[in-house]
């Protein structure tokens, strides 16, 4: 899980979702998981 000021899709499997007011990127590749912090 990377915590970033700006979250971006890294590959075509990445999805940007908003969960409880937190912007997250979920992906099949665990390295691509991010959240905005």
From Swiss-Prot:
Q: Does the keyword Ribosomal protein apply?
A: yes
**Origin organism of this chain?**
Aliivibrio fischeri (strain ATCC 700601 / ES114) (Vibrio fischeri)
Entry-linked SUPFAM superfamilies: Ribosomal protein L36
The GO cellular component terms are:
cytoplasm; ribonucleoprotein complex; ribosome
Signal peptide bounds: none
Query: What PROSITE patterns does its record include?
Result: RIBOSOMAL_L36
| Superkingdom as given in the UniProt entry | Bacteria
Q: Which family does it belong to?
A: Belongs to the bacterial ribosomal protein bL36 family.
Q: Which GO terms describe its biological process?
A: translation
**Protein name per Swiss-Prot or TrEMBL:** Large ribosomal subunit protein bL36
Which keywords belong to this entry?
A: Ribonucleoprotein, Ribosomal protein
